[in-house]
Amino acid sequence: MTFAAVGHLALRTVAVVAISLAILIANDTAPVCAQDYAAIIAQADRSEADRVTDKRRDPVNLLTFTGAKTGWRVLDMGAGAGYSTELMARCVGPTGKVYGQVDEEAEKMRIRMAMPVMNNVTVLVRRSDDPVPSDLHGLDLLTFYFAYHDTTYMGIDRAKMNKAMFAALKPGGFLVIADHSARPEDGTTVGKTYHRIAEQTLRSEIEAAGFKFVADAQFLRHPEDARTSIVFRNPTPVDEFVLKFQKPM
C-alpha cells in the first residue's frame, strides 16, 4: 500500500469516528455510561443506610437500565423514604429536576430532603392515581420501584394511575418499573400478604394505558425463589423483575 493510500485510509477512519461521535453527542437518548453510574453510587456523602440497600438493589445496573442523563426531568413514583429519588437527583444533577411522589410523606423523606443533593427535588404528596399536577408533563423518565404491588390493596385506581403516568411523560419518554415477583397464577392477590405481583399482570396493566414494552432486565432475578413467602422473610433472595416501557412518539 502506498503512503498516499495509507493517508487516505487514515483520513476516512478519522472522518467515520468523528461522524459517529457527533451522532452520539446529538442523540439525546444516549445514556450516561455505566462507569459514571458507578461513580454516582460511590459518592462519599451517601448514607451508610443507602449503601446497605445497594446490596439488594444493584443500583449501578438499575441506573444503567434507566439510561438517566444529566438535565433530565424525572418522576419517582412511590418514593417512600427517598432512596431511589436521591439516586435520580444525583444522576440528573443541578440542571435536571426530580419529583418524588408519595401518598404521605415519611419522616425519613423529610430528613433526606434537608441534604444539599436534594435541592433539585420536589416532593409531591398526592394519591398514586393522581400523582402529578395537571400542568406537569413532558417528563423524560418515570420510575416506580418496589411499590406498584402496594397499589393493589390501597384502594388505588390503577387504570387511572397508569394513564396519569402516560400523560406525564413526553413522547418517547420511558417508564421503568421494578417489583417483587409473584407466581403467574397469583396475579394481584398477594400484594398485601406477600408484597408481590405477577410480572405479566403488571405488564398487561401498563400496556393497557398505551405504553409500549421495550425491555426487561435479569440482574435481580432469582429463579430459586418459590415466590410463596412474604418478601421480608423469604428463605432465599427474592426474585424481582425490572421492566422498561416507552410512550410512543
What residue ranges belong to the model's regions?
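Conserved class I S-adenosyl-L-methionine
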Residues: 71-80
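Class I SAM-dependent methyltransferase SAM/SAH-binding core
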Residues: 81-131
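A conserved beta-strand element that flanks and buttresses the S-adenosyl-L-methionine
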Residues: 143-147
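A short glycine-rich, Lys/Arg-flanked "PGG" loop and its adjoining helix->strand segment in the class I
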Residues: 158-171
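Class I SAM-dependent methyltransferase Rossmann-like catalytic core
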Residues: 37-62
